Amino acid sequence: MFPSLQSFAKKVLARQHVSIDHHIILERCGLWWYKAPISLDCKHMLIKLPNFADGLDLNTALMLATKENNYQLIKMFTDWGADINYGLICANTPPVREFCWELGAKYQVDKKKIMHIFFKLIHPSTTSSNIILCLKLFNDNPFSAYVIIREIKSCIHWKLKKLAEDTNVLSNISDGDMLTIYCFIVALQDNLREAISYVYQHFKYLNTWWLTCVLCYNKVFDLHHLYEKEKIRMDMDEMMRIACTKDNNFLTIYYCFILGANINLAMIASIQFYNIDNLFFCIDLGADAFEEAKALAEQRNYFLISHCLSLDIYSPDSSLLTLKEADPNKIYHLLKNYKSKSILAYLNYDVNNTTL
């Protein structure tokens, strides 16, 4: 199907710099999207929009237009050179699928194209804009989410495995929600604030998962936001257990400690997850369940931990017991240069006894 003269004229116009005074012309010509003019960078074939700072390549723009059932833009982007088979990926209603087929799409969705777009958006140096776009394209898109989850399942379970030791918890999550959680974790790890805020705003029904993720990934400021501002609640000791799933999670462990979580349960959880730095941090905070902890370590053949716990050389670090409120700024500054008093005691004991 050949592009219409009208589409060609729009393409030429989209390449021009048009002053704000003439934006009404662009709007009436259909060169308007997300309350902004559609601009085309022909060198890189990118659609430029304020909402997507990185720009959208034509195929991705086509997918988004299809997801939004925007027939005019579907036709225009296809005329400009987008591959209509990408549009079919996001065609979630029979009329839109029919329209894509009329424009030349194959009758089956190409799974390789789904993965191509996903990995183009989600990668180690991704941006907030990319994560938001990924969620727009693939959330509420059951087939695409199914394809992606099956392809990256091992990676997702690696990121989520300690968040949910009970595998039934993961099995009860839909593919779409699991993909959303995965994208959120990527945003958390890279501190992509715009994407994180977008998730908080648009996926409130997953709030318990957001609390779980920020506990696990040691994000004390996000934890404070969710707990104090959003009023998301969970059993205090369960919050502490989740905070103990990754080693060196001192910020979120301390936050839960100030809220009143049982530090002895945190001591036990740290052994369960074999997180030795967390264990010594709990001892610094006053944990004293040494007999129970030692028995668990021996049961699991954690001989180093068992040996550490058999020594009567530890005492709480009084400098850590000064805060009375769960203020993330104060917690951050208190622990910024934290060195474990208990680890130092163990190392000194070990050196002295080795010398002897």
Curated annotation (Swiss-Prot):
InterPro entries for the chain: Ankyrin_rpt, Ankyrin_rpt-contain_sf, ASFV_MGF360
Broad class of the protein's primary localization: host cell
Glycosylation sites noted in the Swiss-Prot or TrEMBL record: 172, 352-353
KW Cell cycle (keyword) present: no
Membrane topology type: Single-pass membrane protein
Biological process annotations from GO: taxis
Compartments it resides in: Host membrane
Regions crossing the membrane: 249-271
Residue ranges of ANK repeats: 57-89
GO cellular component, one term: host cell membrane
Keywords: ANK repeat, Glycoprotein, Host membrane, Membrane, Transmembrane, Transmembrane helix
Keyword Transit peptide in annotation: no
Family designation: Belongs to the asfivirus MGF 360 family.
Stated role: Plays a role in virus cell tropism, and may be required for efficient virus replication in macrophages.
Name of the protein in question: Protein MGF 360-10L
Organism in which the protein naturally occurs: African swine fever virus (isolate Tick/South Africa/Pretoriuskop Pr4/1996)
Upper taxonomic lineage: Viruses, Varidnaviria, Bamfordvirae, Nucleocytoviricota, Pokkesviricetes
